[in-house]
Design a protein with these regions (language model features):
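Charge-lined substrate channels and their catalytic hotspots, especially those that engage the 3′ end
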Residues: 1-282, 289-335, 371-374, 667-669, ...
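Short beta-strand-to-coil "C-cap" segments at the C-terminal boundary of structured domains/repeats
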Residues: 201, 701-703
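Electropositive polyanion-binding surfaces
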Residues: 31, 185-186, 213-216, 220, ...
Length: 703
């Protein structure tokens, strides 16, 4: 909308807000303001816009009055520059809050705001009118001591003010300590928040203090309660013959685990034999529920955590290590209890028969992704070392290829963004950063786990019992329209009828593969997708193009898997009666929400640790030059990604050879005088100019 329209809105709004105004119909307003017949349509549009913004109301009799602004409740997200946003649950678009309208709101507060406008048809603007509740109780930061008091500088830059620590509330913290501070006052516009120190994490330079600070900032648990540890220790260390009673005995089946070299919690093993022309694939999952009883201290703590969190220097496990690395881990040469999904798969990759059973297994060998990929590459040493397993591994790759092709044909989407592997020295300093290798061995396990998850989900969908599904909804229509408009600038199209199909997204990603705009379009496409979550209703998984999907294969590190194992075992034992069904109907909605929330929190924590360690690593390489690729272009600069997955920003002010303008349609920077362009996918040489570990930012300049 243009400026003229906005000015007219202001004139009409001021008129209706006048103390002498009485409610009028559109014709009456037109008469009083001497609006010509030709302009009445625009007057109606102005009135409609003001009604939509909540500034005025329209009565049943067609009269306009000053509106009682509708109050919207949401969560305040502060910005380092003083403004912020209110995020409203269920709404895709946040409400922008200018600095002068923040009204003392604190990062994370639950607030009420009113809409003040949507200038130029852009995002809604608002004003905070009430702080409903302060959600943040504790903050992590750096303690700075003075003679009679101290301050804590928050690590999270969204907390815009330092926290004042009065004398006697510092818990003997010293200058340079990383601390947790409990807020006692949230401050005023011109007064700092106050607090007391409740935990000293360690000195800022202590190994691991940086990652532990992020862990504390996200309020992740670092210790297990004593009751939980005691319960874990009491669990037996061996599988007895009594434990095996009534179970399908698969100890003579050839099977292996395939994991990363440093993995300790091995919760899945695989077996494969041929049955005529069909494959008999066994996916054998640790029977954790045998040791974690429902409603026990162990179970309550596992649900509270929801998931294990994998960070650069540590794992925050869902279950105590004595269980996750002990009796629950499918260690080679030891009897273990499992829940197995044994599938007969046709040469076309179709599951034509399956059995889910409680089993006892004995893994023959612990193998690594690296070792298996060497076998598949037919390296002589690897073939000799693993000669007993070579035929099975080769058949596994054969089946993996069939399954992957079958998923591809139905429209399964693979974004294939490289994950980052960070190597640390003994002091916690990053010494190397590189992309995680995704090889043929990782794909085998991925394909087999996906198949087991789909098979289990389909069986329990048709059984019509309470269950947890892993669902991924069809993308929002508006988001896909925006994506479609954007990719048209590059000559790509998405065919959307009633709703977009996975095949259309898959086709787009295939078309952009290897092009300069691949990274940007892939990222924007990913952002157009919904987030996967846990639900009781099976609505399918859009990204996998799967009608049925669940999480069955990782009960050591994910609570939803543990939860469905319980339901499956009760069903296998004939104990899933009306009372138990009623019980699951009652508890599963909260379990689904808790697990979805904890998963998002874990992902955010993992992401922040990676960003921090990348900045710390590049800080040690300031002045060095690298080859990179332009991965993003914005009005404030160009983003360049290095082969090691590190991404940094070349600020537009550092493009000194010309004045550059951002062309939004094609995501280019164009020099006004030289006509020089910087485009997506273009190779550039950059020099590291700055890296800030606290802000987790990296800056480059063109070399």
């Amino acid at each position: 909308m243009d400026q003229t329209f906005e000015k007219r809105k202001k004139v009409i709004y001021d008129f209706i807000c006048d103390d002498f105004y009485i409610p009028m119909k559109v014709k009456e307003i037109a008469t009083v303001l001497q609006v010509s017949k030709e302009q009445r349509r625009e007057l109606q549009e102005v009135l409609d816009a003001l009604v939509e913004e909540g500034k005025i109301t329209l009565s049943k009799r067609g009269k306009y009055s000053k509106g009682q602004a509708k109050r919207i409740t949401g969560t305040f997200q502060a910005n380092i520059r003083g403004f912020g946003f209110v995020m409203v649950e269920g709404e895709d678009e946040d409400i922008f809050i200018p600095g002068e309208n923040v009204n003392g709101a604190f990062q994370g507060d639950e607030v009420e705001c009113i809409i003040t406008g949507a200038p130029g048809g852009k995002r809604k603007e608002g004003k905070i009118v009430r702080i409903v509740s302060h959600q943040v109780k504790k903050i992590v930061g750096l303690y700075e001591k003075s003679k009679s008091f101290g301050f804590v500088r928050p690590d999270n830059q969204r907390y815009l003010k330092d926290i004042y620590i009065p004398a006697g509330k510092e818990m003997d913290a010293m200058d340079g300590h990383k601390v947790v501070v409990e807020l006692t006052s949230y401050g005023q516009e011109h007064a700092k928040p106050e607090g007391k120190i409740v935990e000293i994490i360690g000195h800022v330079n202590d190994p691991g203090a940086d990652i532990l600070s992020i862990v504390k900032d996200y309020d992740l648990p670092t210790e297990f309660p004593e009751k939980v540890l005691n319960q874990a220790v009491r669990v037996g260390k061996d599988v007895s013959e009594a434990d095996c009673a009534g179970r399908l005995d698969l100890r003579d089946w050839q099977m292996v685990t395939i994991d990363g070299e440093d993995a300790k919690d091995l919760d899945d093993a695989v077996s494969l034999t041929m049955k005529d022309e069909n494959y008999q694939l066994g996916v054998h999952i640790a029977d954790v529920t045998n040791y974690v009883q429902e409603k026990s201290a162990l179970d309550r703590e596992a649900l509270k955590r929801g998931t294990s969190v994998y960070l650069a220097d540590r794992v925050i496990p869902m279950l105590p290590h004595v269980l996750s690395n002990g009796i629950c881990s499918l260690n080679a040469g030891e009897d273990r209890l499992a829940l197995s999904c044994i599938m007969t798969v046709s040469p076309k990759g179709e599951v034509i028969d399956h059995q889910i059973a409680e089993t006892v297994i004995r893994v023959d060998k612990r193998m690594s992704y690296t070792g298996v990929s060497k076998v598949l590459a037919e390296e002589p040493e690897a073939l000799k070392e693993d000669e007993d397993f070579v035929p099975m591994i080769q058949k596994m790759q054969e089946l993996s290829t069939i399954l992957r092709e079958r998923r591809g044909k139905r429209g399964s989407i693979d974004f294939d963004f490289p994950e980052t592997k960070i190597e640390l020295d003994e002091k916690g300093k990053p010494i190397n950063i590189k992309p995680y290798e995704r090889n043929s061995a990782t794909k085998i396990i991925e394909d087999f786990m996906l198949l087991a998850n789909e098979t289990v989900a389909e069986e329990y969908f048709w059984r019509e019992v309470p269950f947890l599904y892993r669902t991924h909804e069809v993308p929002d229509e508006e988001k896909i329209k925006k994506l479609s408009t954007f990719i048209n600038n590059f000559g790509y199209h998405i065919h959307v009828h009633d709703e977009v199909k996975p095949k259309e997204i898959q086709k787009l990603l295939s078309q952009v593969e290897g092009t300069p705009e691949e990274a940007l379009i892939s990222r924007l496409t990913l952002r157009s997708m919904c987030q996967a979550k846990y639900t009781l209703e099976n609505t399918g998984h859009f990204g996998l193009a799967a009608k049925y999907y669940t999480h069955f294969t990782s009960p050591i590190r994910r609570y939803p898997d543990l939860q469905i194992h319980r339901i499956i075992k009760e069903n296998l034992r004939g104990r899933l009666n009306e009372n138990r069904i009623e019980h699951y109907d009652k508890i599963l909605p909260e379990v689904a929400k808790q697990c979805s929330d904890r998963e998002r929190l874990a992902e955010e924590t993992e992401r922040e640790v990676v960003k921090m360690k990348k900045a710390e690593y590049m800080r040690m390489h300031i002045g060095e030059e690298y080859e990179g690729v332009i991965s993003g272009v914005t009005k404030w600069g160009i983003y360049v990604e290095l082969p090691n997955t590190v991404e940094g920003l070349v600020h537009v002010v550092d493009l000194r050879d010309d004045h550059y303008n951002f062309i939004e349609q094609t995501y280019e920077m164009v020099g006004e005088h030289t006509g020089k362009t910087y485009k997506l996918g273009e190779k550039v040489r950059v020099r590291v100019s700055d890296a800030d570990k606290l802000l987790r930012t990296i800056n480059f300049e063109l070399a």
